[in-house]
């Protein structure tokens, strides 16, 4: 429905922080359902170090669910959701883990199963390194918001900075307000 594509979004991590901080408030919970995210995301979430302005400092709690046989364990994800859970986070790439990247087929299956029980929960896909490798993108299979870096696939390693956020218009409007 809408997107922000900006060189002023310094990186993929910056785009992810903007997204999470725009959608999550004190008392909310985020669950990473594709295992441990990048180290930089752990800093953003307040799980590594104590950088000022991290989400834990803002009262956002965090849980993570490991992959099961290199796939999203959607059954465990559904069981872990509480009244506080506002957003489920999926990291498509391997990050620093030794595992295959998540395919859109696997992500779609998880989103469909989760939406059967929790139709209104936000689902965010960290799409860094995932752009342009399949005919569709995560927003085509039910993700509310897709986030990535312009430095990696879109920028071909040539762009020095930049990030993007694409998804539902009301979400992008909230993120744009946070950015400007």
Each model region followed by its residue ranges:
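Short glycine-rich or small-residue beta-strand-to-loop segments that form or flank ligand, phosphate
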Residues: 4-8
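Conserved PLP-enzyme active-site core in the AAT-like
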Residues: 10-180
């Amino acid at each position: 429905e809408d997107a922000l594509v900006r060189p002023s979004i310094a990186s993929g991590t910056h785009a992810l922080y903007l997204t999470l901080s725009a959608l999550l408030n004190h008392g909310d919970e985020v669950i990473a359902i594709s295992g441990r995210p990048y180290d930089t995301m752990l800093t953003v979430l307040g799980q590594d170090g104590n950088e000022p302005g991290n989400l834990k400092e803002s009262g956002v709690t965090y849980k993570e669910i490991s992959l099961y046989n290199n796939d999203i364990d959607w059954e465990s994800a559904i069981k872990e959701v509480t009244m506080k859970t506002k957003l489920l986070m999926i990291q498509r790439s391997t990050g620093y883990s030794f595992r295959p990247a998540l395919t859109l087929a696997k992500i779609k299956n998880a989103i469909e199963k989760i939406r059967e029980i929790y139709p209104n929960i936000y689902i965010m896909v960290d799409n860094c390194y995932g752009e342009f490798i399949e005919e569709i993108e995560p927003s085509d299979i039910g993700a509310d918001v897709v986030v990535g870096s312009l430095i990696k696939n879109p920028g071909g390693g040539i762009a020095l900075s930049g990030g993007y956020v694409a998804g539902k218009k009301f979400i992008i409007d909230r993120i744009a307000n946070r950015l400007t």
